[in-house]
C-alpha cells in the first residue's frame, strides 16, 4: 500500500537562496534567526530559553539548515540520532509567494511573472474598483493600499462596520485581499464579492494569483480578530500537478487539510478537510492518515507559522509554534507504515526578524521519513519540484516536466 503525507510548515525557510539579493532578502534565515533570538533569551514570551526541536532535529532539520547556510542553528541538537533523509531546496519559480511554492512542490514551477499592485497607496486601478462597486452594489470601499492584514483592521474596521464599505488591500504578493466583518457585512456576501473580484481580475488580464477573503469579528480597534473562515480564490496551475496525475492516472485520493485545496484551485483534490490552528490541523491530519488507503496523498498546510507569526514578525510566537509542532510530531510518525513516506517542507521563508512584513526568498527544508527511507543527506536540491518528481516516481505516475527524484 502506497501513501504519501506532505506537511508544509508555511514560511519555514532555512536560509537565503542564491538569488535572494534580487528580492532584497540576502541574509534572511527564518530558522536561524529565530534560533539566535531564542538563544539570547529574547523570545521568552509564552516559552523559555533556546529553541528546542528534538524531533525535527532527528529528522535532519539542523543538518539541512547547516548545509544551507554553513551554520548549525543554535539550540538544536547537533548529536541527534538521524532517522530521516534531509535536504535543502532552492526555488525555481519567479516569485516567493504561496501558490508558486506549493505548485513547485507538486512539480509545476511558476516560470511566468505574476501581476502585482505595486503602488503602496491607491494600489488598484480605478476601472477595477468601479466594476466591483457596480457589480456588487457596494456603497464604496476602504483601503486601496498595501497593508498588514491586522493593522488595517485596527485602522479601518470601525469605519467598515459603520459604512458597509469593504476593505480592499494588497501586499508585495500577487494578491487582492478583501476584509469584511462576518456579522455586519456577512460571510456569504464577502465570498460573493471575492468571486466577482476573481472574475474581474481574470477577465481584465491582471494576472493576479489570489483573491483572499479575510473575514473578521470584533467591535473596536484592539479586539478585531480574523476568523478561520478565510477563503482563497486562486488561478489553476498551468500544468498537471502530481496531485492531479495521481487522481487521473491511478484513481488515487488527495486529501487537502487546511488551505491546500484553495491553493490548487481544487484541481487534483478529492477531499477537503477544514481546520484552523496548529492543533486542529494536526488532529485532522492524524485522522486522515489513519483512514488513508492505497494511492493516497494527505497534504496539510500549517498556515499559522506564516500568517500569525512570520508576517507579524513575532519571533517568540513563531518559536512557540515550532515547539508545539515538534512536541506533537511523534503522533504523526507512529502512523507511518511500511511503504509510506512523510515529507516535511515549506513553501518560502518569512523571517520574523527581517524588515517589513513580507515573505523572504529562502531555501526550504526537505525532510523525508519512512521505514524504507535511508537516513542521510540528500544534498542541495535545485528546485522544490524534486519533491513532486519523487512523489510521481513513488506512485508510478507519468514523470513531471521539472525536478529530479531524490531516490
Curated annotation (Swiss-Prot):
It is found in: Cytoplasm. Binds 2 manganese ions. Pathway: Carbohydrate degradation; 2-deoxy-D-ribose 1-phosphate degradation; D-glyceraldehyde 3-phosphate and acetaldehyde from 2-deoxy-alpha-D-ribose 1-phosphate: step 1/2. Mn(2+) 1 binds at residues 10, 347-348. Its main location: cytoplasm. GO terms for cellular component: cytosol. The keyword Metal-binding applies. Its cofactor is Mn(2+). CDD domains: PPM. It catalyses: 2-deoxy-alpha-D-ribose 1-phosphate = 2-deoxy-D-ribose 5-phosphate; alpha-D-ribose 1-phosphate = D-ribose 5-phosphate. Its EC number is 5.4.2.7. GO terms for molecular function: magnesium ion binding; manganese ion binding; phosphopentomutase activity. Mn(2+) 2 binds at residues 306, 311, 359. Pfam families: Metalloenzyme (PF01676). NCBIfam families: deoB, PRK05362.1. HAMAP family: Phosphopentomut. Isomerase that catalyzes the conversion of deoxy-ribose 1-phosphate (dRib-1-P) and ribose 1-phosphate (Rib-1-P) to deoxy-ribose 5-phosphate (dRib-5-P) and ribose 5-phosphate (Rib-5-P), respectively. This is Phosphopentomutase.
Amino acid at each position: 500500500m502506497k501513501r504519501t503525507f506532505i506537511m508544509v510548515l508555511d514560511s519555514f525557510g532555512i536560509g537565503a537562496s542564491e538569488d535572494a539579493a534580487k528580492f532584497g532578502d540576502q541574509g534572511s534565515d527564518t530558522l536561524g534567526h529565530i534560533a539566535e533570538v531564542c538563544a539570547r533569551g529574547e523570545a521568552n514570551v509564552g516559552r523559555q530559553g533556546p529553541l528546542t526541536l528534538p524531533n525535527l532535529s532527528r529528522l535532519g532539520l539542523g543538518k539541512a539548515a547547516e548545509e544551507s547556510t554553513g551554520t548549525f542553528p543554535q539550540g538544536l541538537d547537533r548529536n541527534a540520532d538521524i532517522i530521516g533523509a534531509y535536504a535543502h531546496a532552492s526555488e525555481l519559480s519567479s516569485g516567493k509567494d504561496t501558490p508558486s511554492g506549493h505548485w513547485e512542490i507538486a512539480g509545476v514551477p511558476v516560470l511566468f511573472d505574476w501581476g502585482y499592485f505595486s503602488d503602496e497607496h491607491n494600489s488598484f486601478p480605478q476601472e477595477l474598483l468601479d466594476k466591483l462597486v457596480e457589480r456588487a452594489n457596494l456603497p464604496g470601499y476602504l483601503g486601496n493600499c498595501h497593508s498588514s492584514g491586522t493593522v488595517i483592521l485596527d485602522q479601518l474596521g470601525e469605519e467598515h462596520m459603520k459604512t458597509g464599505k469593504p476593505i480592499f488591500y494588497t501586499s508585495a504578493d500577487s494578491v487582492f485581499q478583501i476584509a469584511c466583518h462576518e456579522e455586519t457585512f456577512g460571510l456569504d456576501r464577502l465570498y460573493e464579492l471575492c468571486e466577482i473580484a476573481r472574475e474581474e481580475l481574470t477577465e481584465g488580464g491582471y494576472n493576479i494569483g489570489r483573491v483572499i477573503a479575510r473575514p473578521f469579528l470584533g467591535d473596536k480597534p484592539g479586539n478585531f480578530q480574523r476568523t478561520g473562515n478565510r477563503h482563497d480564490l486562486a488561478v489553476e496551475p498551468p500544468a498537471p500537478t502530481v496531485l492531479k496525475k495521481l487522481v487521473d492516472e491511478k484513481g488515487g485520493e488527495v486529501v487537502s487539510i487546511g488551505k491546500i485545496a484553495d491553493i490548487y484551485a481544487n484541481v487534483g483534490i478529492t477531499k477537503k478537510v477544514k481546520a484552523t490552528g496548529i492543533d486542529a490541523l494536526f488532529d485532522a491530519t492524524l485522522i486522515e492518515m489513519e483512514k488513508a488507503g492505497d494511492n493516497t496523498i494527505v497534504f496539510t498546510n500549517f498556515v499559522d507559522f506564516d500568517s500569525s507569526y512570520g508576517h507579524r514578525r513575532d519571533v517568540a510566537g513563531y518559536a512557540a509554534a515550532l515547539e508545539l509542532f515538534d512536541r506533537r510530531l511523534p503522533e504523526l510518525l507512529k502512523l507511518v507504515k511500511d511503504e509510506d513516506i512523510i515529507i516535511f517542507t515549506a513553501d518560502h521563508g518569512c523571517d520574523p526578524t527581517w524588515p517589513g512584513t513580507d515573505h523572504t526568498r529562502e531555501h526550504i527544508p526537505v525532510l523525508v521519513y519512512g521505514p524504507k527511507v535511508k537516513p542521510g543527506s540528500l544534498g542541495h536540491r535545485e528546485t522544490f519540484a524534486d519533491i513532486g518528481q519523487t512523489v510521481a516516481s513513488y506512485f508510478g505516475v507519468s514523470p513531471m516536466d521539472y525536478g529530479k527524484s531524490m531516490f
